Regions:
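Acidic, polar low-complexity linker/tail segments
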Residues: 1-40, 118, 122-125
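Surface-exposed acidic, glycine-flexible loop patches that form ligand/cofactor-binding
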Residues: 12-16, 55-62, 113-129, 159-161
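…and closely analogous acidic/polar surface helices at protein-protein or active-site interfaces
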Residues: 19, 30-65, 161
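Extended, compositionally biased accessory segments flanking or bridging domains
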Residues: 22-25, 42, 46-52, 80-89
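DG-centered beta-turn motif at the end of beta-strands
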Residues: 26-29, 46, 70, 110, ...
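Short beta-strand-loop
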Residues: 64-94
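Von Willebrand factor
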Residues: 78, 90-131, 145, 168-172
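VWA/integrin I-like adhesion module and closely mimicked acidic/polar interface patches used
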Residues: 141-172
Length: 172
């Protein structure tokens, strides 16, 4: 899948001058149904972690300056929540796990989402400053697809786009 941004004017809190774009990318492959040490499934743990962002201890102004997009991937990558200010995130995601692990596609789509958001910030009628994008990738395993395209795409992105994004991998 190729990330296709909404054609609507991006939702941002107008009172914030500098924004922090954050992509949350969640592995929803079948292996995420495995039980963790505490008896919950891995997907339940990630669901709780991501949903808890709605209750994060930040001021409304700080929450308004963080824009999030939530992606999920198994056999393919899909948008669960298109870009919204963190202050508008309800934390009511319900995740199901099945399929393979299209990790390479998830990385490419996460990069594309950050590029799309940066273009929206830089639109003539917006002119919003942005911090370096953050991508948080929650996964438990190894990709079931060839990673060479994702590696090449990532290297090109890091060399061409300034500022690029930081990618954090959270192993479950």
């Amino acid at each position: 899948m190729v990330y296709i941004p909404s054609l609507e004017k991006p939702r941002v809190k107008e009172t914030c001058t500098t924004h922090q774009p954050v992509v949350i990318c969640i592995d929803t492959s079948g292996s995420m149904n495995e039980k963790a040490e505490d008896g919950r499934t891995k997907i339940e743990i990630v669901e709780q972690m991501v949903n808890s962002l709605s209750k994060i201890d930040l001021s409304e102004s700080e929450k308004g300056a963080v824009d999030i997009c939530v992606l999920a991937f198994d056999d393919e990558c899909r948008v669960l929540q298109d870009w919204i200010p963190l202050s508008d995130f309800k934390g009511n995601l319900k995740l199901d796990a099945e399929g393979c692990t299209a990790l390479g596609s998830a990385i490419i789509d996460s990069i594309d989402a950050t590029r799309a958001r940066r273009r929206a910030y830089q639109a003539p009628d917006y002119g919003i400053d942005a911090r370096r994008a953050q991508i948080f990738l929650y996964t438990d395993g190894i990709s079931t697809e060839d990673m060479s395209k994702a590696i090449e795409y990532s290297q090109d992105y890091l060399n061409r786009d300034k500022p690029s994004a930081k990618l954090y991998t959270i192993l479950i």
